[in-house]
Each structure stands twice: as structure tokens, then as C-alpha cells.
Amino acid sequence: MSQRISLTRYLVEQQRREGHIPAQLRLLLEVVARACKGISQSVNKGALGGVLGTAGSENVQGEVQKKLDIIANEVLIEANEWGGHLAAMASEEMDSIYLVPNRYPQGEYLLLFDPLDGSSNIDVNVSIGTIFSVLKKPDDHAGVEEKDFLQPGNKQVAAGYCVYGPQTTLVLTVGDGVAMFTLDREQGSFVLIEENVRIPEDTKEFAINMSNMRHWDAPVKRYIDECLQGTEGPRGKDFNMRWVASMVADVHRILSRGGIFMYPWDKREPEKAGKLRLMYEANPMGWIVEQAGGSATNGKQRILDIQPGKLHERVSVILGSKNEVERVTGYHSGL
């Protein structure tokens, strides 16, 4: 790429294209990107910044919070609450929605985020990331309530994630394909490195936590068993397994070279539809993957068509290369 295109320029050009995105949405996304830069700085300091280890508290899901979970959550809230683009925010780390204080102007958008995905990897210096989703606030009533957030993923107006690894990379969609940006630390800006990211329809890689195999449902066991049989099995090819235990890192790899990611329902908590959060993880990642030519289902239906019933709803997730996702989904329906 001969000419360096910044995130700001990319978004301005998206705005100019027949008003593809409104100015307020463009400004909101720039603020989210700045917040991700701040989180990246905290992540990079590690032990030198005193940010490693647990915080001695639990989130709404009963998960032990790491210090960086709380720091990242605060960075996103403080960066976004005063800009006038938002009406409210929701976070995986907070019990209920966060209303923009009355002292700040109110916007028309709702921001949802997982401030730091892959928290188990923080202390061992493995890639982690931030996932975010933007919805339009319903305009049929004043104020904001939790029910305003309960929109299916096909109502998203923007979604993205930022992965904090050897490079800090921001991946974004506003409904017109997927673009990747890498943080130039010297300039302090995100620079476009790839547009129209595409996921190959076929793959030889799968990402799943094999230690849970005994707890899976039959269709998932069947799919993985066929992959493990390699060239001698029904698939006629050898597969490799990858598992980072960070959805951001696993999905980023799939966007870069293909693959299928699975976090299925299992028998340990049969009353729960899955482990991952629909609103903070599955919806934004599902839309990004679809915009890159992949597929995303819960094994039975398209993730983006699921009508959420509560803010912290969980869901089974199967996403990535289209033909592989369709195969697993077909096994669930008995095809």
C-alpha cells in the first residue's frame, strides 16, 4: 500500500460515500479507537505498570476480574461518556447499563463492549483484545432502558475489535466489508493495512477447546472426529487444531488465513445456551465474519437473527469459513 491511509481518513471517506455512515457514528468510532490505544498502552506496560493479577472482585457472570479488566472498562467509559455521541453503554463487566450522565450531551447510539477478551492470557503475555458493537437507540420513547439494547445482531451499525499482540490491530466493519488497521506507535494513529478482508470458504484448521470434548453434543463430536481422522477419514484431508483461549486472537487468525472457531453448548451447564455472550462477543464477531464472507451460527440458526432476551445472554458459537460452518450446522439439523 503506497499511500498510508489513517483510520480517520478511512471513516471520512465512508461518510462521504452517499452518507454511508453518519458523522456522529464516525466520531464515535474514532473515540472508541482512541480508547483502544489507551488500553494498549496499559497492556504493554504489564508488570511495570502494576496492572497484572486479579482485582479481588467478580463480574456479573461470577468470573474473577483481572486488574486490566477493570482498567479497560473504565478507559472505555471515560473516553465515550462525554462526546455527545452516545445515550448509554453496556459492558460485560457491569451488571446493568451505564447511562450517559446528564451533565453531558446525549447522542443517538448505544455502545456495547467486552473491554478485555481473553483475560486468562493477561499474566502470561498472550494476545488479548477489546470487542465492541454499536446499535441505534430506538426513537419511539425518551430516555434509555435495558430493553433498548435487546436488538438482534442484524441491527448493528458498526462492530469491531482491537487485538493487543505483537502489533495492536483494529478490525472494523460498518456494513461495507471489513478493514484492518495497525497502530503506528510513533505517529500514534491507526493506519489501514487491508481492505475487503475475505475468509476462505474452505479450511484445514479448527479452533476448539479439546479438553471439553466429553461434554459436547453429538454433532460437534462428529465434526471434530471427522477432522481428526485426516486423509483416511470422510474429509479426505488433514486438519490442524489451534486454540488461544482468546476469542479475539482466534477470530483474528481466521480472518487472516481461514478456519473455524467453535465454543459449543456442553453438558456441564445444560440450562445455558452456551458460554460466550451474545451481545458483547457473538454479535459483533458474527457480523465481522459475515462481512468477510464467512458464516456464524449457534448450530441451529444465524447468530445475527437471534432475538436477545436479556443483556448478558449466552450463546453457542460456530463461526468462520463458510463451508465448514454450514457443515457443522447441518450436522445439528440432521442433514
UniProtKB/Swiss-Prot annotation:
Q: Which GO terms describe its biological process?
A: fructose 1,6-bisphosphate metabolic process; fructose 6-phosphate metabolic process; fructose metabolic process; gluconeogenesis; sucrose biosynthetic process
Q: Which EC main class describes this enzyme? A: hydrolase
**Pfam families, A to Z:** FBPase, FBPase_C
- Any single GO CC term annotated in Swiss-Prot or TrEMBL for this entry: cytosol
Q: Which CDD domains match?
A: FBPase
Q: Which residues bind Mg(2+) 1?
A: E92, D114, L116
According to UniProt, this protein's pathway is: Carbohydrate biosynthesis; gluconeogenesis
Q: What does the UniProt keyword field contain?
A: Carbohydrate metabolism, Cytoplasm, Hydrolase, Magnesium, Metal-binding
**Cofactor(s), by name:** Mg(2+)
The subcellular localization recorded is:
Cytoplasm
Assembly description: Homotetramer.
Q: What is this protein called?
A: Fructose-1,6-bisphosphatase class 1
In the UniProt record, the gene name given for this protein reads: fbp
